């Protein structure tokens, strides 16, 4: 019995494949979404992360509950840490990695990855980390950010929005909405999906 329980907590090739596929899909969806909405600078600065969190929430919840084991929240954020390091600069890696660790810590405890509320909490942490990454470039990593060769105009725009409390609070507040979305729209399907995800099905 104990051996069976232990085996059930181990990652399988299928688990790794699910995480890999869903991370790739979420990355592609995010890039398409950002490309389509990138024309509006104000939207990109304030609402991009909120819209992405809303769109990607079902993918994230399905991935976490399908695997049902500790790790998906951290792995997803590690993916973004690597992407951010390549696209924005190595200085952003600790930001996303730290967010991933916090998100994964929020999932401590038995069966957390089968609890829609716990999964939702980890998702909003992840979304807030993304929403605040542009702020962190101005608040904490300004010198490293400038060293990447970013235009003065970009720095001025980010400084304008991310040093104004009302815009900072607006961006973070609207990003938290996906938690409510996840609670209200996904739980109705969880019991049906669980039977399909069961290893004994």
Describe the residue ranges of each PLM region.
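Hydrophobic transmembrane alpha-helices
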Residues: 2-71, 75
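Interfacial aromatic-anchored transmembrane helix boundaries in multi-pass membrane proteins
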Residues: 34-39, 79-107
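Hydrophobic alpha-helical transmembrane segments
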Residues: 159-181
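Conserved small/polar residues in nucleotide/adenosyl-binding loops
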Residues: 182-188, 201
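Short helix-perturbing small/polar motifs within transmembrane alpha-helices
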Residues: 28, 97-138
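Alpha-helical transmembrane segments of integral membrane proteins
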Residues: 14-22, 48, 52, 71-76, ...
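Alpha-helical transmembrane segments of multipass membrane proteins
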Residues: 22, 26-30, 56, 60, ...
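Juxtamembrane non-transmembrane "cap" segments at the membrane-aqueous interface
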Residues: 131-155
């Amino acid at each position: 019995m104990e051996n069976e329980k232990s085996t059930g907590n181990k990652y399988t090739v299928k688990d790794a494949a699910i995480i890999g596929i869903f991370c790739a899909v979420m990355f592609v969806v995010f890039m398409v979404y950002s490309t389509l909405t990138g024309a509006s600078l104000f939207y990109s600065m304030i609402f991009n992360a909120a819209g992405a969190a809303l769109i990607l929430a079902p993918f994230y919840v399905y991935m976490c509950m399908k695997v049902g084991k500790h790790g998906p929240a951290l792995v997803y954020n590690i993916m973004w840490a690597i992407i951010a390091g390549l696209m924005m600069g190595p200085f952003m890696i600790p930001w996303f990695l730290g967010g991933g660790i916090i998100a994964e810590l929020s999932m401590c405890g038995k069966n957390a990855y089968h609890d829609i509320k716990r999964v939702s909490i980890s998702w909003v942490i992840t979304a807030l980390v993304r929403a605040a990454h542009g702020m962190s470039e101005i608040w904490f990593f300004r010198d490293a950010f400038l060293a990447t060769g970013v235009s003065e105009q970009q720095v001025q725009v980010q400084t304008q929005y991310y040093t104004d409390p009302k815009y900072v609070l607006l961006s973070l507040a609207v990003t938290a909405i996906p938690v409510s979305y996840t609670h209200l729209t996904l739980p109705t399907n969880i019991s049906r999906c669980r039977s399909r995800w069961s290893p004994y099905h």
